[in-house]
């Protein structure tokens, strides 16, 4: 049993024209012709319907108005010629198109189906515009996503060396500190002593300049902590307001000398 389906086409007046599918109408018309009932075309033309009638599959006897409209607009001979030039699987669509156009032509003899064609073309243009707008919006989102991906990639590339430098900067001092605390305490002590000597030398230079301003004879001795201690020679005792300093701690002093100048024997032995 053939399946039946139909399609509806709007008309300008507001009515709907229903067009049956090819399989359903052809099967029904073939069954009607098999019972001896002529098709609508042969009945309208008042002729005997033959088994090989070209109109029988497409113009059933229960819908005579379909052939009447087609015959009035296009003519039976023109329709017969057109159907004979087409393949059998194309004839059903051709007959439905002729029937629809003939019905619209009878409703509007001037424009026919032009109004429906204009409506369909306008709908097609609207859909094309909507599609183009949707593609444009989609392209903007795609460009934004690509820009964000590129920015994140560049950020990751720039942060790579910086992160490595931070890792090295955080790791090396801890390791160096542990290394010094465990195995290099002696080296650390020597470095501290050198720094202390450097500080004492700066202090000694400052005091040396101060003592020269008082026209005294500056002498220095090597202290127990590895630095210099400042004092005045015992020969300066009673020789001015600076004579009260005397020798520092009663220890022997080393007289500071200057290259190219005469040394005076004033240090206590």
Curated annotation (Swiss-Prot):
- Keyword hit for Cell membrane: no
Look up keyword DNA-binding and say if it applies. Answer: no
Enumerate the subcellular locations listed in this protein's record, separating them with semicolons: Nucleus
Q: Name one GO cellular component term.
A: nucleus
Q: Taxonomically, which superkingdom?
A: Eukaryota
Q: Which UniProt keywords apply?
A: Developmental protein, Nucleus
Q: InterPro entries, per this entry? A: LOB (IPR004883)
- Pinpoint the LOB domain residues: 37-138
Q: What is its main location?
A: nucleus
Q: Name the PANTHER family on file.
A: LOB DOMAIN-CONTAINING PROTEIN 4-RELATED, PROTEIN ASYMMETRIC LEAVES 2
Protein family (similarity comment): Belongs to the LOB domain-containing protein family.
Main role?
A: Negative regulator of cell proliferation in the adaxial side of leaves. Regulates the formation of a symmetric lamina and the establishment of venation.
Full protein name: LOB domain-containing protein 6
Organism in which the protein naturally occurs? Oryza sativa subsp. indica (Rice)
Lineage start: Eukaryota, Viridiplantae, Streptophyta, Embryophyta, Tracheophyta
